[in-house]
């Protein structure tokens, strides 16, 4: 079977790696992929906004299945387009992808189906938003409505910070902004919860604790994710049941009533307040770096799981996991998430010795004249499975240090709440 993967990040390399070990998979194509996927798949350069070009490449290479990694093609409707052209594709429809594409869409769904979430207001212009925050209680949360690569969220402590956030959003920092949300600040701990669904059956696909802030101790600016560990230390049987019954099941039901089945991975961003879950956000794909953290724990055949979803037979498939802890640290280009240099040579990659249960997934990398260069903010993901998180983190940091790359930096405290406290 020939499989195509859309995307170029660490998530896509992790998916590529998981599919590459399956005997039934004869060839993998990545659109466009990175230096890591190039070792186990055929990378094909493509404009992901040109669906006709993508269709031509899929048909001409006789690809049997497409797996969509990132959110933008999903929100833009790539699944609907490929299905209309009789191409088997794994991922949610354009309408279902509005769960991530529009925070307002999701908030309205929460209201209709009584899904617990923070209280909120929707604002269409600067004046109304500023007028509201001047009378509001702090802290509060301000969010850009559309896609923002995980960075369009501000936690504001005063009027000055709120006004700056409002101005940046309406000035187009995260693309054209027609609306923004202002939410109450929930005091609790964040957790990432994953499921896979074919629109009828829902199955759990792991939990993780992401580290969004760029600096140690969860300080500094928001990023796409500096590292993660799995499982989350917050999860327990009672909380698990609440998440499924109060949040996920009503969401899938609501989409069905709108006329679209949710088929694909769903990433549920939660705030846990005294063991009660509140929805912060939905992402309509696996997280990054959570995907890199969770997939190495998967014991079952990923291709079989994906195909069962495409064929609405997920209820017939059992998903099994290795009973181990997993921890991921992201190596970033210096300067990230602000300006950083591109096309920086990464030496010593071949000198890294990865033992069993250790992985290095590429993200913002490219091959130029047979050498690997950093071209993105998040560059490499180092992952380790172990019986405990401290051992996993120690081995990951040893691997990063053996690389000795002067152009990068990373957080040394990933997992600190489960290891150091």
Predicted feature residues:
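ATP-binding N-terminal substructure of ATP-dependent carboxylate-amine bond-forming enzymes
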Residues: 1-94
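Short, charged, surface-exposed secondary-structure boundary motifs
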Residues: 38-41, 56, 98-104, 215-216
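Short acidic-hydrophobic, aromatic-tinged amphipathic segments that line or gate anion-handling sites
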Residues: 43-49, 121-125, 156
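A conserved helix-loop-beta module that forms one wall/lid of the active-site cleft
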Residues: 90-151
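Internal nucleotide-binding/catalytic subdomain
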Residues: 152-291
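Active-site "cap" helix and flanking loop/linker of ATP-utilizing ligase/carboxylase catalytic domains
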Residues: 244-266, 283-356, 368-370
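Generic C-terminus detector
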Residues: 365-369, 373-421
């Amino acid at each position: 079977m020939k499989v195509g993967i859309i995307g170029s990040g660490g998530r896509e390399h992790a998916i590529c790696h998981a599919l590459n070990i399956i005997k039934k998979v004869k060839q993998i194509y990545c659109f466009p992929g990175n230096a890591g996927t190039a070792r186990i798949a055929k990378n094909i350069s493509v404009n992901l906004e040109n669906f006709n070009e993508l269709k031509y490449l899929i048909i001409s290479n006789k690809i049997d299945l497409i797996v969509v990694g990132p959110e933008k093609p999903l929100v833009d409707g790539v699944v609907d387009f490929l299905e209309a052209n009789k191409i088997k594709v794994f991922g949610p429809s354009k309408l279902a992808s509005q769960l991530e594409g529009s925070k307002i869409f999701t908030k309205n769904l929460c209201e209709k189906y009584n899904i617990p979430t923070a209280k909120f207001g929707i604002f269409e212009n600067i004046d109304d938003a500023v007028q509201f925050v001047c009378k509001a209680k702090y802290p509060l949360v301000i969010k850009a409505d559309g896609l923002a690569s995980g960075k369009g969220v501000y936690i504001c402590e005063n009027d000055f910070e709120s006004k700056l956030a409002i101005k940046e959003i309406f000035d187009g920092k995260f693309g054209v902004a027609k609306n923004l949300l202002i939410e109450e600040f929930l005091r609790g701990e964040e957790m990432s919860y994953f499921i896979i669904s074919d629109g009828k059956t829902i199955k759990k696909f792991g939990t993780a604790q992401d580290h969004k802030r760029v600096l140690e101790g969860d300080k500094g600016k928001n990023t796409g994710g500096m590292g993660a560990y799995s499982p989350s230390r917050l999860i327990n049987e009672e909380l698990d049941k609440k998440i499924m019954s109060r949040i996920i099941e009503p969401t899938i039901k609501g989409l069905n009533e709108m006329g679209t089945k949710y088929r694909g991975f769903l990433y549920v961003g939660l705030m846990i307040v005294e063991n009660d879950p509140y929805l912060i956000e939905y992402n309509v794909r696996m997280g990054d770096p959570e995907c890199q953290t969770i997939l190495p724990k998967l014991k079952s055949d990923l291709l079989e799981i994906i195909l069962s979803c495409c064929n609405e037979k997920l209820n017939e498939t059992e998903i099994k996991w290795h009973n181990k802890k997993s921890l991921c640290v992201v190596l970033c280009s210096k300067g990230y998430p602000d300006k950083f240099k591109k096309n920086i040579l990464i030496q010593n990659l071949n000198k890294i010795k990865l033992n069993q249960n250790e992985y290095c997934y590429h993200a913002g990398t490219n091959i130029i004249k047979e050498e690997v260069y950093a071209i993105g903010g998040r560059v490499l993901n180092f992952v380790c499975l172990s019986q405990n998180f401290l051992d996993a983190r120690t081995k990951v940091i040893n691997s990063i240090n053996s690389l000795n790359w002067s152009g990068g930096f990373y957080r040394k405290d990933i997992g600190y709440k489960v290891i150091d406290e």
